[in-house]
Protein backbone atom coordinates (compact mmCIF):
# COMPACT_ATOMS: atom_id res chain seq x y z
CA UNK A 1 0.00 0.00 0.00
CA UNK A 2 1.29 3.44 -0.94
CA UNK A 3 2.39 5.52 2.04
CA UNK A 4 1.19 9.10 2.30
CA UNK A 5 3.75 11.63 3.49
CA UNK A 6 2.11 13.30 6.49
CA UNK A 7 3.45 16.68 7.62
CA UNK A 8 2.90 19.08 10.51
CA UNK A 9 3.20 22.80 9.77
CA UNK A 10 1.49 25.52 11.78
CA UNK A 11 2.33 28.24 9.25
CA UNK A 12 0.76 27.19 5.97
CA UNK A 13 0.46 28.95 2.63
CA UNK A 14 -2.52 27.84 0.55
CA UNK A 15 -0.53 28.39 -2.63
CA UNK A 16 1.59 25.37 -1.67
CA UNK A 17 -1.33 22.94 -2.02
CA UNK A 18 -3.64 21.78 -4.78
CA UNK A 19 -6.45 20.83 -2.38
CA UNK A 20 -7.86 22.26 0.84
CA UNK A 21 -10.07 20.11 3.09
CA UNK A 22 -12.42 22.31 5.10
CA UNK A 23 -14.88 21.26 7.84
CA UNK A 24 -18.26 22.96 7.72
CA UNK A 25 -20.84 23.03 10.52
CA UNK A 26 -24.58 23.43 10.14
CA UNK A 27 -25.72 26.96 9.36
CA UNK A 28 -22.65 27.14 7.08
CA UNK A 29 -20.24 28.05 9.89
CA UNK A 30 -16.63 26.91 9.54
CA UNK A 31 -13.20 27.33 11.12
CA UNK A 32 -10.93 30.27 11.78
CA UNK A 33 -8.90 29.35 8.70
CA UNK A 34 -12.03 29.64 6.56
CA UNK A 35 -12.62 33.13 7.88
CA UNK A 36 -9.02 34.12 7.23
CA UNK A 37 -9.21 32.73 3.69
CA UNK A 38 -12.52 34.55 3.10
CA UNK A 39 -14.39 31.27 2.63
CA UNK A 40 -17.04 31.85 5.28
CA UNK A 41 -19.25 33.71 2.80
CA UNK A 42 -19.01 30.80 0.35
CA UNK A 43 -20.00 28.12 2.88
CA UNK A 44 -22.78 30.33 4.23
CA UNK A 45 -24.19 30.87 0.73
CA UNK A 46 -24.10 27.16 -0.09
CA UNK A 47 -25.96 26.42 3.13
CA UNK A 48 -28.58 29.13 2.58
CA UNK A 49 -29.21 27.88 -0.97
CA UNK A 50 -29.63 24.33 0.29
CA UNK A 51 -26.69 23.11 -1.80
CA UNK A 52 -24.60 21.98 1.17
CA UNK A 53 -26.32 21.42 4.51
CA UNK A 54 -23.14 20.23 6.27
CA UNK A 55 -24.64 17.03 7.65
CA UNK A 56 -22.10 14.60 9.16
CA UNK A 57 -20.58 12.56 6.35
CA UNK A 58 -21.73 14.91 3.59
CA UNK A 59 -18.99 16.12 1.22
CA UNK A 60 -18.80 18.44 -1.76
CA UNK A 61 -15.80 19.04 -4.01
CA UNK A 62 -15.49 22.49 -5.57
CA UNK A 63 -13.07 23.03 -8.45
CA UNK A 64 -11.13 26.25 -9.01
CA UNK A 65 -13.03 28.00 -6.20
CA UNK A 66 -12.89 31.77 -6.15
CA UNK A 67 -10.82 33.61 -3.54
CA UNK A 68 -8.35 30.79 -2.81
CA UNK A 69 -5.27 29.59 -4.65
CA UNK A 70 -6.18 25.89 -4.62
CA UNK A 71 -7.40 23.80 -7.52
CA UNK A 72 -9.88 22.03 -5.25
CA UNK A 73 -11.84 22.77 -2.12
CA UNK A 74 -13.31 19.74 -0.35
CA UNK A 75 -16.12 20.71 2.01
CA UNK A 76 -16.82 18.16 4.75
CA UNK A 77 -20.04 18.32 6.76
CA UNK A 78 -19.74 18.11 10.55
CA UNK A 79 -23.28 18.89 11.70
CA UNK A 80 -23.83 20.75 14.96
CA UNK A 81 -20.47 21.38 16.68
CA UNK A 82 -22.15 21.17 20.10
CA UNK A 83 -23.39 17.64 19.50
CA UNK A 84 -20.56 16.28 17.32
CA UNK A 85 -19.75 12.73 18.46
CA UNK A 86 -16.71 10.58 17.83
CA UNK A 87 -18.85 8.34 15.62
CA UNK A 88 -20.05 11.32 13.59
CA UNK A 89 -16.54 12.71 13.31
CA UNK A 90 -15.12 9.42 12.04
CA UNK A 91 -17.97 9.07 9.54
CA UNK A 92 -17.03 12.48 8.19
CA UNK A 93 -13.35 11.52 7.99
CA UNK A 94 -14.15 8.36 6.05
CA UNK A 95 -16.41 10.28 3.67
CA UNK A 96 -13.68 12.87 3.12
CA UNK A 97 -11.11 10.15 2.47
CA UNK A 98 -13.38 8.52 -0.11
CA UNK A 99 -14.04 11.84 -1.86
CA UNK A 100 -10.33 12.60 -1.94
CA UNK A 101 -9.51 9.15 -3.29
CA UNK A 102 -11.91 9.77 -6.20
CA UNK A 103 -10.19 13.04 -7.10
CA UNK A 104 -6.85 14.03 -8.56
CA UNK A 105 -5.59 15.54 -5.31
CA UNK A 106 -1.83 15.16 -4.80
CA UNK A 107 -0.73 17.69 -2.18
CA UNK A 108 -3.39 18.39 0.45
CA UNK A 109 -3.88 20.77 3.36
CA UNK A 110 -6.17 19.12 5.91
CA UNK A 111 -7.92 21.39 8.44
CA UNK A 112 -10.32 18.78 9.84
CA UNK A 113 -8.15 18.69 12.97
CA UNK A 114 -9.56 22.12 13.87
CA UNK A 115 -12.89 20.42 14.48
CA UNK A 116 -12.67 18.03 17.44
CA UNK A 117 -15.42 16.18 19.36
CA UNK A 118 -15.71 17.00 23.05
CA UNK A 119 -13.22 15.40 25.47
CA UNK A 120 -10.62 14.85 22.74
CA UNK A 121 -7.56 16.86 21.76
CA UNK A 122 -5.61 17.84 18.66
CA UNK A 123 -3.26 14.84 18.83
CA UNK A 124 -6.29 12.53 18.88
CA UNK A 125 -7.71 14.27 15.81
CA UNK A 126 -4.36 13.99 14.00
CA UNK A 127 -4.23 10.29 14.87
CA UNK A 128 -7.75 9.62 13.56
CA UNK A 129 -7.20 11.64 10.37
CA UNK A 130 -3.93 9.88 9.63
CA UNK A 131 -5.47 6.47 10.24
CA UNK A 132 -8.51 7.22 8.05
CA UNK A 133 -6.67 8.73 5.09
CA UNK A 134 -3.88 6.13 5.06
CA UNK A 135 -6.40 3.29 5.36
CA UNK A 136 -8.46 4.71 2.48
CA UNK A 137 -5.66 3.72 0.08
CA UNK A 138 -6.04 0.01 0.90
CA UNK A 139 -7.04 -2.17 -2.03
CA UNK A 140 -6.82 -5.95 -1.90
CA UNK A 141 -4.46 -7.12 -4.63
CA UNK A 142 -3.50 -10.75 -5.09
CA UNK A 143 -2.87 -13.12 -7.97
CA UNK A 144 -6.23 -14.73 -7.21
CA UNK A 145 -7.88 -11.46 -8.26
CA UNK A 146 -7.35 -10.76 -11.96
CA UNK A 147 -7.29 -6.97 -11.99
CA UNK A 148 -5.71 -5.71 -15.21
CA UNK A 149 -5.04 -2.17 -14.02
CA UNK A 150 -4.69 -1.81 -10.25
CA UNK A 151 -5.62 1.68 -9.13
CA UNK A 152 -2.62 3.82 -8.25
CA UNK A 153 -3.54 6.49 -5.67
CA UNK A 154 -2.55 10.01 -6.69
CA UNK A 155 -2.33 11.41 -3.16
CA UNK A 156 1.29 11.97 -2.12
CA UNK A 157 1.29 14.30 0.87
CA UNK A 158 -1.06 15.66 3.52
CA UNK A 159 -0.22 18.57 5.79
CA UNK A 160 -1.93 19.38 9.07
CA UNK A 161 -2.02 23.01 10.18
CA UNK A 162 -0.50 22.15 13.56
CA UNK A 163 2.73 22.49 15.50
CA UNK A 164 5.22 19.62 15.14
CA UNK A 165 5.07 18.76 18.85
CA UNK A 166 6.28 15.41 20.15
CA UNK A 167 2.69 14.40 20.89
CA UNK A 168 1.48 15.30 17.40
CA UNK A 169 4.39 13.51 15.74
CA UNK A 170 3.72 10.42 17.86
CA UNK A 171 0.09 10.50 16.73
CA UNK A 172 1.09 10.58 13.06
CA UNK A 173 3.67 7.81 13.38
CA UNK A 174 1.47 5.53 15.47
CA UNK A 175 -1.55 5.96 13.22
CA UNK A 176 0.34 5.36 9.99
CA UNK A 177 2.12 2.29 11.38
CA UNK A 178 -1.23 0.97 12.62
CA UNK A 179 -2.84 1.53 9.22
CA UNK A 180 -0.03 -0.34 7.47
CA UNK A 181 -0.32 -3.13 10.03
CA UNK A 182 -4.05 -3.28 9.36
CA UNK A 183 -3.33 -3.60 5.64
CA UNK A 184 -1.19 -6.69 6.25
CA UNK A 185 -3.89 -8.15 8.49
CA UNK A 186 -6.50 -7.51 5.79
CA UNK A 187 -4.33 -8.98 3.04
CA UNK A 188 -3.74 -12.20 4.98
CA UNK A 189 -7.34 -12.61 6.07
CA UNK A 190 -8.81 -11.78 2.65
CA UNK A 191 -6.56 -14.27 0.89
CA UNK A 192 -8.26 -17.53 -0.20
CA UNK A 193 -7.44 -20.40 2.12
CA UNK A 194 -5.81 -22.43 -0.66
CA UNK A 195 -3.20 -19.64 -0.76
CA UNK A 196 -3.09 -18.58 2.89
CA UNK A 197 -2.15 -21.87 4.52
CA UNK A 198 -0.27 -22.41 7.79
CA UNK A 199 2.88 -22.68 5.68
CA UNK A 200 2.16 -19.31 4.05
CA UNK A 201 1.66 -17.67 7.45
CA UNK A 202 4.98 -19.13 8.58
CA UNK A 203 6.70 -17.81 5.45
CA UNK A 204 5.15 -14.39 6.08
CA UNK A 205 6.55 -14.37 9.61
CA UNK A 206 9.98 -15.38 8.31
CA UNK A 207 9.92 -12.58 5.74
CA UNK A 208 8.96 -10.07 8.44
CA UNK A 209 11.78 -11.32 10.65
CA UNK A 210 14.22 -10.71 7.82
CA UNK A 211 12.86 -7.21 7.17
CA UNK A 212 12.67 -6.00 10.77
CA UNK A 213 15.21 -8.13 12.60
CA UNK A 214 12.73 -10.20 14.61
CA UNK A 215 13.75 -13.59 15.97
CA UNK A 216 11.61 -16.32 14.42
CA UNK A 217 11.03 -19.96 15.30
CA UNK A 218 8.64 -22.31 13.49
CA UNK A 219 7.64 -25.53 15.26
CA UNK A 220 6.75 -28.41 12.92
CA UNK A 221 4.21 -31.17 13.48
CA UNK A 222 6.65 -33.91 14.56
CA UNK A 223 8.25 -31.62 17.13
CA UNK A 224 4.88 -30.58 18.56
CA UNK A 225 3.77 -34.20 18.84
CA UNK A 226 6.94 -35.04 20.78
CA UNK A 227 6.38 -32.06 23.07
CA UNK A 228 2.91 -33.35 23.97
CA UNK A 229 0.64 -30.79 22.29
CA UNK A 230 -2.15 -33.34 22.12
CA UNK A 231 -4.94 -30.79 21.95
CA UNK A 232 -3.51 -28.75 19.06
CA UNK A 233 -2.42 -31.87 17.17
CA UNK A 234 -5.88 -33.42 17.56
CA UNK A 235 -7.38 -30.56 15.55
CA UNK A 236 -4.62 -30.76 12.94
CA UNK A 237 -4.71 -34.52 12.39
CA UNK A 238 -7.57 -34.41 9.87
CA UNK A 239 -5.89 -31.86 7.60
CA UNK A 240 -3.50 -32.57 4.72
CA UNK A 241 -1.78 -29.19 5.15
CA UNK A 242 0.86 -29.43 7.90
CA UNK A 243 0.24 -27.38 11.07
CA UNK A 244 2.71 -24.79 12.31
CA UNK A 245 3.45 -23.06 15.59
CA UNK A 246 4.77 -19.67 14.50
CA UNK A 247 6.83 -17.71 17.03
CA UNK A 248 8.19 -14.18 16.61
CA UNK A 249 10.18 -12.14 19.12
CA UNK A 250 10.68 -8.38 19.08
CA UNK A 251 13.28 -7.03 21.52
CA UNK A 252 13.17 -3.28 22.01
CA UNK A 253 14.12 -3.25 25.70
CA UNK A 254 16.73 -4.97 27.86
CA UNK A 255 16.73 -8.74 27.44
CA UNK A 256 16.08 -9.15 31.18
CA UNK A 257 12.68 -7.47 30.84
CA UNK A 258 9.86 -10.02 30.60
CA UNK A 259 8.00 -9.75 27.30
CA UNK A 260 4.34 -9.15 26.64
CA UNK A 261 2.93 -12.11 24.70
CA UNK A 262 0.36 -11.98 21.91
CA UNK A 263 -1.24 -15.31 20.99
CA UNK A 264 -3.40 -15.50 17.86
CA UNK A 265 -5.65 -18.28 16.61
CA UNK A 266 -4.59 -19.28 13.10
CA UNK A 267 -7.21 -21.68 11.71
CA UNK A 268 -6.76 -20.94 8.02
CA UNK A 269 -10.00 -22.71 7.16
CA UNK A 270 -12.61 -24.06 9.54
CA UNK A 271 -15.12 -26.57 8.19
CA UNK A 272 -16.10 -27.48 11.74
CA UNK A 273 -14.51 -30.90 11.28
CA UNK A 274 -16.78 -33.89 11.90
CA UNK A 275 -19.22 -31.45 13.56
CA UNK A 276 -19.59 -29.93 10.10
CA UNK A 277 -20.75 -26.35 9.67
CA UNK A 278 -23.69 -25.44 7.38
CA UNK A 279 -22.66 -24.79 3.79
CA UNK A 280 -24.09 -21.28 3.65
CA UNK A 281 -21.37 -18.65 4.09
CA UNK A 282 -18.77 -21.31 4.85
CA UNK A 283 -16.43 -19.43 2.50
CA UNK A 284 -16.09 -16.86 5.28
CA UNK A 285 -14.37 -19.44 7.45
CA UNK A 286 -11.13 -18.44 5.74
CA UNK A 287 -11.35 -15.55 8.22
CA UNK A 288 -10.94 -17.93 11.16
CA UNK A 289 -7.26 -17.01 11.21
CA UNK A 290 -8.17 -13.42 12.08
CA UNK A 291 -6.34 -13.67 15.39
CA UNK A 292 -3.14 -14.77 13.67
CA UNK A 293 -3.49 -12.05 11.03
CA UNK A 294 -3.98 -9.48 13.80
CA UNK A 295 -0.83 -10.55 15.62
CA UNK A 296 1.22 -10.28 12.43
CA UNK A 297 -0.33 -6.88 11.70
CA UNK A 298 0.67 -5.66 15.16
CA UNK A 299 4.21 -6.90 14.56
CA UNK A 300 4.28 -5.02 11.26
CA UNK A 301 3.53 -1.85 13.23
CA UNK A 302 6.13 -2.74 15.89
CA UNK A 303 8.77 -3.21 13.21
CA UNK A 304 8.08 0.30 11.93
CA UNK A 305 7.76 2.05 15.31
CA UNK A 306 10.55 0.21 17.17
CA UNK A 307 9.19 0.91 20.69
CA UNK A 308 11.25 0.23 23.80
CA UNK A 309 9.59 -2.96 25.04
CA UNK A 310 9.79 -6.70 24.43
CA UNK A 311 6.95 -8.53 22.68
CA UNK A 312 6.56 -12.15 21.57
CA UNK A 313 4.00 -13.63 19.21
CA UNK A 314 2.81 -17.22 19.23
CA UNK A 315 0.48 -18.41 16.46
CA UNK A 316 -0.89 -21.97 16.37
CA UNK A 317 -2.01 -22.52 12.78
CA UNK A 318 -3.86 -25.37 11.11
CA UNK A 319 -6.95 -26.23 9.10
CA UNK A 320 -9.93 -27.93 10.75
CA UNK A 321 -11.09 -30.58 8.30
CA UNK A 322 -13.31 -33.69 8.32
CA UNK A 323 -11.44 -36.86 7.40
CA UNK A 324 -11.21 -40.53 8.26
CA UNK A 325 -8.55 -39.75 10.82
CA UNK A 326 -10.10 -36.52 12.14
CA UNK A 327 -11.04 -36.13 15.80
CA UNK A 328 -14.59 -37.18 16.67
CA UNK A 329 -17.12 -36.03 19.25
CA UNK A 330 -16.44 -38.02 22.39
CA UNK A 331 -12.68 -38.32 21.86
CA UNK A 332 -10.45 -37.40 24.80
CA UNK A 333 -7.08 -35.70 24.29
CA UNK A 334 -4.28 -34.62 26.63
CA UNK A 335 -3.10 -31.03 26.36
CA UNK A 336 0.47 -29.79 26.77
CA UNK A 337 -0.46 -28.71 30.31
CA UNK A 338 -1.34 -32.32 31.19
CA UNK A 339 -5.05 -31.58 31.53
CA UNK A 340 -7.39 -33.83 29.55
CA UNK A 341 -10.24 -32.61 27.36
CA UNK A 342 -13.35 -34.39 26.12
CA UNK A 343 -14.17 -33.12 22.65
CA UNK A 344 -17.94 -32.82 22.51
CA UNK A 345 -17.91 -30.62 19.41
CA UNK A 346 -15.09 -30.55 16.87
CA UNK A 347 -16.22 -27.09 15.75
CA UNK A 348 -15.02 -25.69 19.08
CA UNK A 349 -11.48 -26.15 17.81
CA UNK A 350 -10.08 -22.68 18.43
CA UNK A 351 -9.80 -23.19 22.16
CA UNK A 352 -8.16 -26.57 21.56
CA UNK A 353 -5.26 -25.05 19.65
CA UNK A 354 -5.07 -21.96 21.85
CA UNK A 355 -4.75 -23.88 25.11
CA UNK A 356 -1.54 -25.57 23.97
CA UNK A 357 -0.24 -22.30 22.56
CA UNK A 358 -0.91 -20.55 25.87
CA UNK A 359 0.92 -23.27 27.80
CA UNK A 360 3.86 -23.22 25.38
CA UNK A 361 4.07 -19.41 25.59
CA UNK A 362 4.30 -19.49 29.38
CA UNK A 363 6.84 -22.32 29.44
CA UNK A 364 9.07 -20.81 26.75
CA UNK A 365 8.93 -17.03 27.18
CA UNK A 366 7.89 -16.43 30.82
CA UNK A 367 5.83 -13.36 29.78
CA UNK A 368 4.69 -10.62 32.14
CA UNK A 369 1.24 -10.79 30.56
CA UNK A 370 -0.54 -12.59 27.73
CA UNK A 371 -3.23 -11.28 25.42
CA UNK A 372 -4.79 -13.89 23.15
CA UNK A 373 -7.11 -13.05 20.28
CA UNK A 374 -9.39 -15.28 18.26
CA UNK A 375 -12.46 -15.38 16.09
CA UNK A 376 -13.68 -17.79 18.72
CA UNK A 377 -17.45 -17.81 19.19
CA UNK A 378 -20.57 -17.00 17.23
CA UNK A 379 -22.08 -16.22 20.63
CA UNK A 380 -19.92 -13.09 20.74
CA UNK A 381 -21.66 -11.78 17.62
CA UNK A 382 -25.05 -12.45 19.21
CA UNK A 383 -23.99 -10.58 22.34
CA UNK A 384 -22.09 -7.60 20.91
CA UNK A 385 -22.82 -7.51 17.19
CA UNK A 386 -20.09 -6.18 14.93
CA UNK A 387 -19.33 -2.95 16.77
CA UNK A 388 -17.13 -4.16 19.63
CA UNK A 389 -14.87 -7.08 20.46
CA UNK A 390 -15.27 -8.92 23.75
CA UNK A 391 -12.54 -8.86 26.39
CA UNK A 392 -12.30 -11.18 29.39
CA UNK A 393 -9.40 -11.83 31.72
CA UNK A 394 -8.02 -12.71 35.13
CA UNK A 395 -6.28 -9.34 35.68
CA UNK A 396 -8.56 -6.31 35.88
CA UNK A 397 -5.74 -3.81 35.32
CA UNK A 398 -4.85 -5.58 32.07
CA UNK A 399 -8.47 -5.61 30.95
CA UNK A 400 -8.82 -1.93 31.86
CA UNK A 401 -5.73 -1.05 29.81
CA UNK A 402 -7.13 -2.83 26.77
CA UNK A 403 -10.52 -1.15 27.17
CA UNK A 404 -8.84 2.26 27.48
CA UNK A 405 -6.81 1.75 24.30
CA UNK A 406 -9.90 0.54 22.49
CA UNK A 407 -11.80 3.64 23.54
CA UNK A 408 -8.93 5.94 22.56
CA UNK A 409 -8.57 4.45 19.08
CA UNK A 410 -12.31 3.77 18.68
CA UNK A 411 -11.44 0.11 18.13
CA UNK A 412 -13.45 -0.82 21.15
CA UNK A 413 -13.69 -3.74 23.59
CA UNK A 414 -16.51 -4.59 25.98
CA UNK A 415 -15.70 -6.55 29.12
CA UNK A 416 -17.64 -9.73 29.78
CA UNK A 417 -17.39 -11.66 33.07
CA UNK A 418 -15.37 -14.64 34.16
CA UNK A 419 -16.63 -16.61 37.16
CA UNK A 420 -16.14 -20.09 38.57
CA UNK A 421 -19.92 -20.49 38.39
CA UNK A 422 -19.55 -21.01 34.63
CA UNK A 423 -17.12 -23.88 35.21
CA UNK A 424 -20.11 -26.10 35.91
CA UNK A 425 -20.91 -26.03 32.19
CA UNK A 426 -17.49 -27.45 31.30
CA UNK A 427 -17.72 -30.56 33.48
CA UNK A 428 -17.06 -33.92 31.84
CA UNK A 429 -17.64 -37.44 33.11
CA UNK A 430 -14.67 -38.71 31.12
CA UNK A 431 -11.98 -36.00 31.24
CA UNK A 432 -10.84 -33.00 33.25
CA UNK A 433 -13.11 -30.79 31.17
CA UNK A 434 -15.29 -30.66 28.07
CA UNK A 435 -14.47 -28.35 25.19
CA UNK A 436 -17.94 -26.76 25.09
CA UNK A 437 -20.40 -25.64 27.73
CA UNK A 438 -23.71 -25.61 25.90
CA UNK A 439 -25.56 -22.74 24.24
CA UNK A 440 -25.78 -20.44 27.25
CA UNK A 441 -22.98 -17.89 27.76
CA UNK A 442 -20.92 -19.33 24.91
CA UNK A 443 -18.35 -16.53 24.80
CA UNK A 444 -17.85 -16.70 28.55
CA UNK A 445 -17.51 -20.49 28.76
CA UNK A 446 -14.97 -20.43 25.91
CA UNK A 447 -12.88 -17.94 27.87
CA UNK A 448 -13.49 -19.92 31.07
CA UNK A 449 -11.98 -22.91 29.27
CA UNK A 450 -8.86 -20.90 28.34
CA UNK A 451 -8.62 -19.55 31.90
CA UNK A 452 -7.75 -23.08 33.06
CA UNK A 453 -4.50 -22.78 31.13
CA UNK A 454 -3.53 -19.28 32.31
CA UNK A 455 -3.83 -19.46 36.09
CA UNK A 456 -0.19 -18.50 36.69
CA UNK A 457 0.00 -15.44 34.41
CA UNK A 458 -1.79 -12.12 33.91
CA UNK A 459 -4.01 -12.89 30.95
CA UNK A 460 -6.71 -11.35 28.78
CA UNK A 461 -8.72 -12.91 25.97
CA UNK A 462 -10.14 -11.01 23.00
CA UNK A 463 -13.01 -12.57 21.07
CA UNK A 464 -12.96 -10.80 17.70
CA UNK A 465 -15.52 -12.98 15.91
CA UNK A 466 -17.79 -10.00 15.27
CA UNK A 467 -15.16 -7.44 14.31
CA UNK A 468 -12.44 -9.18 12.26
CA UNK A 469 -14.43 -9.07 9.02
CA UNK A 470 -17.70 -7.87 7.52
CA UNK A 471 -20.11 -9.78 5.28
CA UNK A 472 -22.38 -8.63 2.47
CA UNK A 473 -21.54 -6.57 -0.61
CA UNK A 474 -18.52 -5.00 1.13
CA UNK A 475 -17.25 -8.37 2.37
CA UNK A 476 -13.70 -8.24 3.62
CA UNK A 477 -11.35 -8.16 6.57
CA UNK A 478 -11.41 -5.03 8.73
CA UNK A 479 -7.88 -5.07 10.15
CA UNK A 480 -9.26 -4.84 13.68
CA UNK A 481 -8.16 -4.83 16.45
CA UNK A 482 -4.66 -3.81 15.30
CA UNK A 483 -5.03 -0.10 16.26
CA UNK A 484 -6.14 -0.84 19.81
CA UNK A 485 -3.40 -3.42 20.39
CA UNK A 486 -0.67 -1.15 19.03
CA UNK A 487 -1.84 1.60 21.37
CA UNK A 488 -2.04 -0.85 24.28
CA UNK A 489 1.56 -1.94 23.73
CA UNK A 490 2.86 1.63 23.43
CA UNK A 491 1.10 2.52 26.69
CA UNK A 492 3.08 -0.24 28.46
CA UNK A 493 6.38 1.61 27.99
Swiss-Prot record:
Binding site for Mn(2+) 2: 265, 270, 288, 349
Keyword field: Aminopeptidase, Cytoplasm, Hydrolase, Manganese, Metal-binding, Protease
Binding annotation for Mn(2+) 1: 270, 347, 349
Annotated disulfide bonds: none
Cofactor note: Binds 2 manganese ions per subunit.
Record flagged with keyword Metal-binding: yes
Coiled-coil features, chain-numbered ranges: none
One Pfam family, short name: Peptidase_M17
Gene Ontology MF annotations: manganese ion binding; metalloaminopeptidase activity
Catalytic activity: Release of an N-terminal amino acid, Xaa-|-Yaa-, in which Xaa is preferably Leu, but may be other amino acids including Pro although not Arg or Lys, and Yaa may be Pro. Amino acid amides and methyl esters are also readily hydrolyzed, but rates on arylamides are exceedingly low; Release of an N-terminal amino acid, preferentially leucine, but not glutamic or aspartic acids
Domain of life, per lineage: Bacteria
Annotated Gene Ontology cellular component terms: cytoplasm
Localization per record: Cytoplasm
GO BP annotations, alphabetical order: proteolysis
InterPro entries in the cross-refs: Leucine_aapep/pepB, Macro_dom-like, Peptidase_M17_C, Peptidase_M17_leu_NH2_pept, Peptidase_M17_N
UniProt-listed SUPFAM superfamilies: Macro domain-like, Zn-dependent exopeptidases
Active site: 277, 351
Enzyme class: hydrolase
Family statement: Belongs to the peptidase M17 family.
Functional note: Presumably involved in the processing and regular turnover of intracellular proteins. Catalyzes the removal of unsubstituted N-terminal amino acids from various peptides.
NCBIfam families linked to this entry: PRK00913.1-2, PRK00913.1-4, PRK00913.2-4
Protein name per Swiss-Prot or TrEMBL: Probable cytosol aminopeptidase
Lineage summary: Bacteria, Pseudomonadati, Pseudomonadota, Gammaproteobacteria, Thiotrichales
Gene: pepA
